[in-house]
Amino acid sequence: MLLSSVAYADTCPIPEGGSAALGSMDAKDRIELLHATFDSQAVYAKRWKWAWFGIGMTTLAGSVGQAVGWAAFVDESNPKREADIIDNVIVSGFSVVGPFVSLIFAPSIEKDAPAIDQLLKDTGGGAAGSCLVIARMEELMRRDVSEEEFNVGWFQHVIAVVGVGALFGILFGEALGTSDPIAAQEHRNNAISNSLVGLVLTELQILTSPSGAIGAWNRYLGGRFSAKKTAAFSVAPMFGAAGLSFRVTF
């Protein structure tokens, strides 16, 4: 049981890359700043995860629905019928990856935030062993920042292009494998349209991926803790609906 006389340390050691300004900051202020960053970024990460899960499931349902629709309601004499059934089945196979990746590889900061809440609860808001509390918070934040940097880095864009390129290649290959010119053109049309949509959605998913901890961590290391708030513009997937949300935060 913690005693009310437990007090915060005046100052705590500086993490690697930290400035002298950070070292002179009160332990309590450092804890509060890190805690606020965990909380705000966890909220965004959760919304991002479920928004893109919803977008992915909508895309999957659309592809499956079109395949079923062409199979059930379009006359077999229609030269586009088989091409659209095949292409939508292929697109469905690619679409199933997105929503489950959003869940399996959800940003770690979403689960780290509750762990920090529990840590602060167990230590009286960080007063008991404040420097150890800060060290643990910094450890988790550094890991989450590294993850965010990877998730928005160039490699993710390469993966996006490769994945969409594979989809385009498979659909275009179907066009090369048919002798019916109408069916071949339908395959080509589907290759172009689905690849463009896939690339746009994938890039938007990367560009809206949680990255706020990166800037917050750099400001923390630099000891820039001015109470003055600045405006920040961001684009995010809408939570609970298809579309994008443009927002300005202060």
Model-found features: residue ranges?
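N-terminal Sec/ER secretory leader and immediately downstream segment
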Residues: 41-76, 83-87
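Glycine- and aromatic-enriched membrane insertion/assembly motifs of diderm outer-membrane
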Residues: 66-71, 82, 86-108
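Mid-membrane cores of alpha-helical transmembrane segments in multi-pass membrane proteins
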Residues: 55-62, 91-95, 158-166
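Juxtamembrane "helix-exit" motif on the non-cytosolic side of transmembrane helices
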Residues: 67-77, 171-180
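Hydrophobic alpha-helical transmembrane segments
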Residues: 79-94, 183-197
